[in-house]
């Protein structure tokens, strides 16, 4: 624990195109090697692609996808008397959003489509329909928490 206390959270600016902080967070997750304009081009292209396929506002589609991917529970390692237990804990709202965005981007990078724009758009669309690898990751996380429910009394 730092002596000065926790570092203050920096305020996120709203995205200039959609006016959404979620889109800004998504751009920052796609960002690699400081190439922000490339990350913005990828995200905006993916959202436009999603708009063409669904005919609805892409930010609403993104929010629906995130709601389907956000975990409610996760497991944390806790050492008790020489044994390490996987203890299920509830996920804070900001962490669940961060995890959902991280999973969306990482699983879209593993997809087979030709461009990153197509991969991200299809992963967002799949997640908004309750399909895709990122939704499966959430289900696996919940299954792991449920399987280790016996250790919930070690929560801190």
Curated annotation (Swiss-Prot):
Report the InterPro entries cross-referenced here.
Ribosomal_uS7, Ribosomal_uS7_bac/org-type, Ribosomal_uS7_CS, Ribosomal_uS7_dom, Ribosomal_uS7_dom_sf
Q: Which GO terms describe its cellular component?
A: small ribosomal subunit
UniProt GO MF annotations = rRNA binding; structural constituent of ribosome; tRNA binding
* Coiled-coil regions, chain positions: none
Listed GO biological process terms: translation
What CDD domains is this protein classified in?
uS7_Bacteria
Q: What UniProt keywords apply to this chain's record, in alphabetical order?
A: Ribonucleoprotein, Ribosomal protein, RNA-binding, rRNA-binding, tRNA-binding
Keyword rRNA-binding in the entry? The reply is yes
Q: Which residues form the signal peptide?
A: none
- Domain of life, per the record? Bacteria
| Biological function | One of the primary rRNA binding proteins, it binds directly to 16S rRNA where it nucleates assembly of the head domain of the 30S subunit. Is located at the subunit interface close to the decoding center, probably blocks exit of the E-site tRNA.
Quaternary structure note: Part of the 30S ribosomal subunit. Contacts proteins S9 and S11.
Entry similarity comment: Belongs to the universal ribosomal protein uS7 family.
Q: State the HAMAP family in the record.
A: Ribosomal_uS7_B (MF_00480_B)
Name of this protein: Small ribosomal subunit protein uS7
UniProt lineage? Bacteria, Bacillati, Actinomycetota, Actinomycetes, Mycobacteriales
